[in-house]
Regions:
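Cysteine protease catalytic core and zymogen-processing segment of caspase-like enzymes
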Residues: 1-13
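Phosphate-binding and adjacent anionic-ligand microenvironments
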Residues: 16-154
């Protein structure tokens, strides 16, 4: 969720007291750097399954104002129930005008971590996820990464 530039809008919403429940809704595919930035800024986050449907569903149930996916689909629940690129652009422009700074400067502090997406075809997804060897390999990678990265198998 939330590429670098819309995260500027999240911080702006927090500054102005408009980040309801101090929470942003993301998906399990969101960049690791995003969570580190939110932690540093004291912004809470919730992770949902991938898809606007799941993001908005969580937002509606929990009174959250902003959420989205890494793809750039950003939802502002006060105005829409799906991602809206024009609305997102307007919200980012609002911050740039108020702060009198270019987006490049506003978004500079956010470090985006490298990500690798591997699609592996299997005949039985549940069996593959429940396989002890797969679980052990995932655990080993997660331990090796520590707090510098993550592994997601879905």
């Amino acid at each position: 969720m939330l590429p670098a530039k819309p995260t500027v809008t999240v911080a702006w919403m927090k500054e102005r007291g408009k980040l309801l429940n101090n929470t942003v809704v993301t998906t399990v595919m969101s960049n690791f750097g995003l969570y580190k930035a939110f932690d540093e800024q004291g912004i809470g986050y919730a992770k949902t399954a991938v898809g606007d449907k799941y993001v908005y569903e969580y937002m509606a149930k929990n009174g959250c104002r902003i959420g989205g996916e890494q793809s750039g689909h950003i939802i502002f629940s006060k105005y829409a129930s799906t991602g809206d690129g024009i609305l997102t652009s307007l919200k980012m422009m609002e911050v740039m005008l108020a702060k009198k700074k270019p987006m490049s400067e506003l978004a500079a502090p956010l470090k985006i971590y490298p990500q690798v997406l591997e699609n592996v075809r299997v005949t039985d997804k549940k069996a593959a996820q429940n396989d002890e060897a797969v679980q052990a390999a995932v655990k080993n990678v997660a331990e090796a990464l520590g707090d510098t990265g993550r592994i997601l198998v879905r």
